[in-house]
Amino acid sequence: MGTQGKVIKCKAAIAWKTGSPLCIEEIEVSPPKACEVRIQVIATCVCPTDINATDPKKKALFPVVLGHECAGIVESVGPGVTNFKPGDKVIPFFAPQCKRCKLCLSPLTNLCGKLRNFKYPTIDQELMEDRTSRFTCKGRSIYHFMGVSSFSQYTVVSEANLARVDDEANLERVCLIGCGFSSGYGAAINTAKVTPSSTCAVFGLGCVGLSAIIGCKIAGASRIIAIDINGEKFPKAKALGATDCLNPRELDKPVQDVITELTAGGVDYSLDCAGTAQTLKAAVDCTVLGWGSCTVVGAKVDKMTIPTVDVILGRSINGTFFGGWKSVDSVPNLVSDYKNKKFDLDLLVTHALPFESINDAIDLMKEGKSIRTILTF
């Protein structure tokens, strides 16, 4: 391509400061350096993590190009890159896999040593590995976000944060595999390890929670209880496999008590995809004593407490990062599974908008009116 080795000028949505709408700007994207790949973003989505990053309580650095769920096409590669070439369809992701570090070499985790700040993984990777940015706007250096920065027509990522996918992949659907779908689906399949004929409770029915329901159903769960304070999400949850839907605001007792009664003692597996203090407590309390397992998929609070006796009596709590998938190895397989109709991503997409309407997409999510909005350039 004629742009290889050159600075590219393109559109991007920049968060200049906390709490303000994103601004569509013209930015300059530098060529990739060693072990980096420059991508033309074809489709991207808004995830709650992008919105939460602008919260003043978070530690995000500004100005920043947000976005971390997308799919695109390789425009050019930096020195030393041999696994990608211009024209490849790719999915970047926030969970790197360098395949060299102690963590990557262990079968026990999907974490990678390239993450520098494990305490705040969602705001890590704000610069490239040489600690510089590939983005500039109006003479200012702009921070990256979670190693992806998909709210730009072009972005630069580490090859450890990228997977080549099927040439026939529908990028406007498989972009969900870059975060939301993989996180929820994998939480059920890989982390909770839901078993056939088991009972499950899924808290929070956004993209991650609905994807967890898909995972529970594919794993063979006999009963899947979906919980959310927005009842408008229940029809979609049932279409994806939920057998029961509960709105805690419409119950006369705590939702965990209702779930315990419905399942004669508690569910085998709970997955908290909402991450509030209330849902974390309920997700633990609704599991059966003896073997009940709670998987924490997302957390909006820094700490959670659990009575010691719960642990002694057999309840367990697991955390999951990117659904437990080793990203570079697993993402191509997930794309193939979608192509082979093992699961359907279409029900997770509620809106499609031009990239310039990104703030409308954010409003739709804040108002609980969308699951995923696909933005295209």
Curated annotation (Swiss-Prot):
NAD(+) binds at residues 49, 204-209, 228, 233, 297-299, 320-322, 372. Its EC number is 1.1.1.105. Binds 2 Zn(2+) ions per subunit. InterPro entries: ADH-like_C, ADH-like_N, ADH_Zn_CS, GroES-like_sf, NAD(P)-bd_dom_sf. It catalyses: all-trans-retinol + NAD(+) = all-trans-retinal + NADH + H(+); 9-cis-retinol + NAD(+) = 9-cis-retinal + NADH + H(+); 20-hydroxy-(5Z,8Z,11Z,14Z)-eicosatetraenoate + NAD(+) = 20-oxo-(5Z,8Z,11Z,14Z)-eicosatetraenoate + NADH + H(+); 20-oxo-(5Z,8Z,11Z,14Z)-eicosatetraenoate + NAD(+) + H2O = (5Z,8Z,11Z,14Z)-eicosatetraenedioate + NADH + 2 H(+). Oxidation of 20-HETE is inhibited by low concentrations of N-heptylformamide. Oxidation of 20-HETE is a decreased by 55-65% by either all-trans-retinol or all-trans-retinoic acid. Strongly inhibited by omega-hydroxy fatty acids. One of its GO terms (molecular function) is all-trans-retinol dehydrogenase (NAD+) activity. Changing S183T: Strongly increases activity towards ethanol, increases KM for benzoquinone 10-fold. Belongs to the zinc-containing alcohol dehydrogenase family. Class-II subfamily. Catalyzes the NAD-dependent oxidation of either all-trans-retinol or 9-cis-retinol. Also oxidizes long chain omega-hydroxy fatty acids, such as 20-HETE, producing both the intermediate aldehyde, 20-oxoarachidonate and the end product, a dicarboxylic acid, (5Z,8Z,11Z,14Z)-eicosatetraenedioate. Also catalyzes the reduction of benzoquinones. Dimer. This is All-trans-retinol dehydrogenase [NAD(+)] ADH4.
